[in-house]
Regions:
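Membrane-interface alpha helices of multi-pass inner-membrane proteins
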Residues: 107-126, 130, 164-166
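Transmembrane-helix motifs of polytopic, lipid-linked glycan transferases
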Residues: 29-58
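Membrane-interface transmembrane helices that cradle and orient dolichyl/undecaprenyl
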Residues: 90-107, 143-144
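Membrane-embedded alpha-helical segments of multi-pass membrane proteins
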Residues: 33-41, 79-91, 131
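Short hydrophobic/aromatic helix or loop-helix immediately within or flanking a transmembrane segment
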Residues: 1-24
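Perimembrane helix-loop-helix junctions
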Residues: 130-169
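Aromatic- and kink-enriched transmembrane "portal" helix at the membrane-lumen/periplasm boundary
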Residues: 23-29, 61-85, 116-117, 121
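Membrane-lumen/periplasm interface segments of specific transmembrane helices
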Residues: 161-197
C-alpha cells in the first residue's frame, strides 16, 4: 500500500461503493463526478478571470485548460481528484475580484482552510505549486496597488494575502497531524517520523 498519504478520496469512493452494493456502474459515476467537478471549477475560474480582466482573456484561459492533454488525461482520475488542485486558486481569485466585501473575505478564509485540508488528505502532491499559484492574483493586485500608491488598498490586499496564506498552512498542518496520529496509532511524533514508509 501507499502509506505516505491519508487517501481521503479512496475512503470516500469506497464508502459510496459499499453503500450502493459495489455496483459496477459506480466506477463510471465516480470518473464522471471528478471530470464534471473539474470542468465546473475551471469554468468558474475562467469566468472570474474574465470578470477581472476581460472576456477574451477568460476565454483564452478556459481554452488553454480545455486543450491541455495533461489536464484532460487526469480529469477522471480517482487518485488525483484533479479538481481539488484548482479550488484554492478559485478561492483567491474570487477574493481578488471582491476584495472590499468583508463577508466574502471571511468565507474565503474558512473555505481556504478546508480546500487545502481536503487536498492534503487526498494527497500532498503539488501542494507548494498550488499554494503559490493561488496567491498569484493577489500578489499582482498588491504590486499594482503599490505602484498606484494606494496605501489603504495595499494594506487590505497584504492583510488578506497573509490571512489566506496562514489558514492554508493551517489546513496543511492539520492534515499532517491527523494523518500522523492515525499512522502512529495515536503517537503523532512517531507517525510523522514514519510518514515516508
Amino acid at each position: 500500500g501507499y502509506y505516505s498519504q491519508y487517501g481521503l478520496q479512496g475512503k470516500f469512493f469506497g464508502l459510496l461503493s459499499k453503500a450502493f452494493n459495489e455496483n459496477a456502474m459506480m466506477l463510471a459515476v465516480f470518473h464522471n463526478f471528478c471530470a464534471v467537478m473539474l470542468a465546473v471549477v475551471l469554468a468558474t475560474i475562467s469566468f472570474e478571470v474574465a470578470f477581472k480582466y476581460n472576456k477574451m482573456f477568460g476565454l483564452i484561459f478556459y481554452i488553454t485548460f480545455g486543450l491541455s492533454p495533461w489536464i484532460a488525461n487526469f480529469a477522471k482520475n480517482l487518485y488525483w481528484v484533479e479538481f481539488t488542485w484548482f479550488v484554492p486558486i478559485l478561492i483567491c481569485l474570487v477574493v481578488s475580484n471582491r476584495l472590499e466585501n468583508r463577508k466574502i473575505r471571511t468565507a474565503a478564509y474558512i473555505s481556504m482552510f478546508f480546500a487545502v485540508f481536503i487536498k492534503c488528505l487526498c494527497g500532498y502532491e503539488y501542494i507548494t505549486t498550488i499554494l503559490v499559484a493561488s496567491m498569484t492574483f493577489l500578489a499582482t493586485d498588491l504590486i499594482c496597488a503599490v505602484a498606484e500608491k494606494n496605501k489603504e488598498k495595499s494594506k487590505l490586499i497584504f492583510k488578506t494575502t497573509c490571512i489566506l496564506s496562514a489558514v492554508a498552512l493551517c489546513g496543511f498542518f492539520v492534515a499532517i497531524l491527523l494523518h500522523a496520529n492515525i499512522k502512529g496509532d495515536g503517537n503523532i511524533i512517531e507517525g510523522i517520523i514514519n510518514s515516508g514508509t
